[in-house]
From Swiss-Prot:
Reaction catalysis annotation: RNA(n) + a ribonucleoside 5'-triphosphate = RNA(n+1) + diphosphate
GO molecular function, one term: zinc ion binding
Keyword NAD recorded: no
Organism lineage string: Bacteria, Pseudomonadati, Bacteroidota, Flavobacteriia, Flavobacteriales
Name of this protein: DNA-directed RNA polymerase subunit beta'
Co-factor: note: Binds 1 Mg(2+) ion per subunit. Binds 2 Zn(2+) ions per subunit.
NCBIfam families: rpoC_TIGR (TIGR02386)
Amino acid sequence: MMENRNNNNNRDKNPVKRFNKISIGLASPESILAESRGEVLKPETINYRTHKPERDGLFCERIFGPVKDFECACGKYKRIRYKGIVCDRCGVEVTEKKVRRDRVGHINLVVPIAHIWYFRSLPNKIGYILGLPSKKLDMIIYYERYVVIQAGIAQNAEGESIKRLDFLTEEEYLNILDTLPADNQYLDDFDPNKFVAKMGAECIMDLLARINLDELSYDLRHKANNETSKQRKTEALKRLQVVESFRESNKNRENRPEWMIMKVVPVIPPELRPLVPLDGGRFATSDLNDLYRRVIIRNNRLKRLMEIKAPEVILRNEKRMLQESVDSLFDNTRKASAVKTESNRPLKSLSDSLKGKQGRFRQNLLGKRVDYSARSVIVVGPELRLFECGIPKDMAAELYKPFVIRKLIERGIVKTVKSAKKIIDKKEPVVWDILENVIKGHPILLNRAPTLHRLGIQAFQPKLIEGKAIQLHPLVCTAFNADFDGDQMAVHLPLGPEAILEAQLLMLASHNILNPANGAPVTVPSQDMVLGLYYMTKERLTTEGHIILGQDLVFYSAEETNIALNEGRVELNARVKIRAKDFNEEGELVYKIIQTTAGRVLFNEVVPEAAGYINDVLTKKNLRDIIGKILAVTDVPTTAAFLDNIKDMGYKFAFKGGLSFSLGDIRIPEQKTQLIADARAQVEGISGNYNMGLITNNERYNQVIDIWTSANAQLTELAMKNIREDQQGFNSVYMMLDSGARGSKEQIRQLTGMRGLMAKPKKSTAGGGEIIENPILSNFKEGLSILEYFISTHGARKGLADTALKTADAGYLTRRLHDVSQDVIVNIEDCGTLRGVEVSALKKNEEIVESLGERILGRVVLQDVVNPLTNDILVHAGEQITEAIMKVIENSPVEKVEVRSPLVCEATKGICAKCYGRNLATGKMTQRGEAVGVIAAQSIGEPGTQLTLRTFHVGGVAGGISEESNILAKFAGRLEIEDLKTVKGEDGEGNLVDIVISRSTEMKLIDQKTGILLATNNIPYGSSIYVNDAQVVEKGDVICKWDPYNGVIVSEFTGKIAYEDLEQGQSFMVEIDEQTGFQEKVISEGRNKKLIPTLLVYGKNDELIRSYNLPVGAHLMVNDGEKIKAGKILVKIPRRSSKTGDITGGLPRITELLEARNPSNPAVVSEIDGVVSFGKIKRGNREIVIESKFGEIKKYLVKLSSQILVQENDFVRAGVPLSDGAITPDDILRIQGPAAVQQYLVNEIQEVYRLQGVKINDKHFEVVIRQMMRKVRVQDPGDTLFLEDQLIHTKDFIVENDKLYGMKVVEDSGDSSNLKAGQIITPRELRDENSLLKRTDKNLVIARDVITATATPVLQGITRASLQTKSFISAASFQETTKVLNEAAVAGKIDYLEGLKENVIVGHRIPAGTGMREYDHTIVGSKEEYNDLMVAKEEFNY
């Protein structure tokens, strides 16, 4: 064998092993020895004088290989010709030094040692298998107690027989030995009479070796099924899980519990724990060497002590120290007393080198540094084409060096590589010629960190430029999120022909015009370009003071207009007419006379004809739509050329227009002083009301905030109007704002109006951001006073602090999203599911937020969509909804469409193309191999960072609009009001009105002619209603009004008030207002939890008519004994003043939703439809009883401090909250089912992004939520092998149940010898067996039908879902590395390398796109090679 190995050339020595799965398991002592190259006997590393490795030490050359290439330790054999020879003097094999990176040694331990992972981490594997608690296990392992392994005939001091697993002190152990017969210790260990007790890991090894897993599994299953106590049942199930893991793992490979105890410790290769000489004769060493040294020193000392037969006490102490040193070698963080260096830093153990960002997985396997790369500062390249970038010459010469060298040799300019390098380094002119040729058709990749989505790396065709900076095309800046204030970019060079092809066809910048997150163009002109285009297409008319040349001229063609412009006969912004091609009603391109401006004529010269004549002012939003439209009607090259043209045009006209602004362009409205004076007067009026005690302090505060908010809004409107009308809208500031080039309404407001209300500094991040009620009245043009400036600084600094903190959060969110959805790949065309998701327009407060068309565009419909009026089929089942179909559906009365969705896709691996629908980056149907999971994660995560960075744009100014306090009819129509109960009462002005006292009043507004539902609203409890059921209303009529600042409780009856449990100082406090001296009674949470503050209403005959429970914080408006009329407000409950919302609230909200966390004070939700009644109070909770029509009763406990939203005798539906607070996703899943919770999550997350103006397509969230819901929890395992409460993949669950379908379970095997009770057989086998028994008159087999398992769907957070993927490699590289690996090893898991991450880690191509496994056998070649093969095929007929 040895000779053979020497003769083969180097390449065959390590052939690339092809593998398609990886399994993991516990290493047996034999397998460690088989891998090892020798035993490390000495703790020495290298000799301090010769600096050579010590023999048999931790760096020994005989074990690990030579330190120098092809040179043995003593120097007898040098050079490559002796390769493979083992030196007879020093025993070192002559080979390359790199073998020191992969040769492993070992240490033979004198006593077995328990592996820390299996007794210190939870769940405690050894403890669960033996059924011992962790504390007791530690007592055994660290040599504190003896444990009985086999009791034999032993008895304790009282003469009782002892049991297995009894713990004995040393004294008890010795006493028992004294009482035993002398020959007992000479019996065989497995003789039932022998008494065996041991301590330490060898005792555990013995116990584990004696365990019969099958029997233990049977016992535990029996226990789990028949145990009455909940605790013992869960205990049995937990143990069963570990036992089943071992049993399962033995199917694939041998995996024995006693291997959790080690007899041999492997020593990792020395190059992976190097010893580096520093200057000054000292050495820097890896921590692992210290840890190994401690193990070897203690092991050798123990060996010596045993040889000299030292006393037991000393041995035991040494064994315990050895156990501790092996513990810290494997995992130094788990121990209370970690081994530390002199500088008090814990040493890095083997586990630490796997964990975390600096660990093996994330540092070296998932992210590697690459060759052929460069980086430099970027500058703008306005004359580049969209697919080009400028690369400095020197950088290119270095990057393309090998290609240049090859050409130099080919041309015969040089003979050797070395001389070619010299020529390149000298930068001789011939090099540049060759370089120009080499880079043709050889693109490079540009990457800007942070790469948040796939547009962060794009391919460009390089152009050689002078200088040292990379030139970047201005239109791709948006995608890279780059600007030119010193950003740097990295350059990478694709080397192989396949890589070059992929870069050119898939990654070229001109192919990435659309954003994968929402399908809108991402290469959109911004800033100067938009401003220039806006300016050139804006219309200006002649006024007295300003005459526009050439107004209303008529031109025959664009050429004519051009001539007139150049000759100065017509101005750019003049209104003119022109004969040009545009679409008519039928959608055909024809010549017509169009009224337009000279600038627009110029612009339309570069617009492709297929797009018609664009006659609009170009704002950023318009441009985005135009680019999208042009891409849809033409192709990528046309669009790319168009983009380049408008880029040049934009810059040209921004320069020609000279658009900049001065202080004079910022116009402050004259009415400002008057507005502020009015607002101040109103505030004073409110303070007066407050001083007289008419309103509470909270109401006063809320109203003041409202007044200033609306004053500010009015002022902003005035300022905008001013600036809009200045110079016909040619005010530079207004143009920048209106075109979308820079600035926002908010910023204009702060420059010209007033800065407005500011948020109060928070003490903690969790605290509320209240609003300071005195606004900043100055604006930046006038300048701020010292106090105003001081208040402002808080907001500005908060913005910067938030940015720094939140970027990390957003990055972590992206990482979790990637991990959970990385293995979702489009694997098949159609999964054939019959399920879908019903989509309708998304409304908020009756405003349509997202129309039906927008939501279904690019989806595949599940069933035919039919127009309800005409019964025409608008789109057939299985068709994609294109823009054209979308318009048809929008114009029809269809309100709901059922579409395919990733949420319901039934593909076994990944997802199918039909359920996913359109690929947003191309606008066509998704192809197989598309990594949609990663794209979803990027699309959701990328704006996360943007959002976090967006808080500071308006330095802490409190946004918010005045609270709404009424409902107006949005359309004319007929009202239908359901569940309306009212009483007569007085409103704030003392007029008689109807007051609503029902909680679930709903109004529907119906079109009188068609009967179509136009709008629905809930009418709030306590509001004054001005209409009746079936009344016809006009648009704008007031339907109802309410107090926006307070929730109220209104009396339904006339009568007399009595207080119950209302004791001052206990259940309510009297708050005396310092300024007014007015007293208010406010309900507070007292110490006495039994008190339930209640108002009782008594009728005429002193009978109790009604009682009202009062929530904490309610203000009482009536006194004890007061006589009241129906409709009287009894209690006001102040609504919490509006907090300032920024995405700081947004990012944690998204995290909360995606992690499926339950909110801190969740609402109590009804699980059934029924009628409400109130029960007793238990431990500070009020009991709410709901009884359904069918007599089912459910009881709920609601905290007294939370507000109850239902009243006695209300009818509630399942899923309706009974108390205030957020509804938990778990409740929705439990009560309304998986579809409801999926919709809830999608809509809630979208809501957060929508507030920030970020558009993300629903399907990305659906992909992630699909991954969160891929598990079910077993409720009843039936006859399957599942365990109760076990989490399993839905697919596996269905497969197992399907296997059992139609089978039988033997209950009584009768006289059959083949079947046992509990066995699962087919009906056929049962029939055959029984017919055999019948013939011989024996007892027949009795069997019953199989009981299949039942399970409920589970919603897991993205972190949990990532850690529970099928792939242990992916999970380990995510979080909790040691825990994942230790569970995988026990279960002997197999990773089939199906996701992207695990393939990156093992160095395979990812199974997506061109790396899909079915293309593995495809050979890529040239056309000629193919033709040659074809000819051969015909000739030889194969």
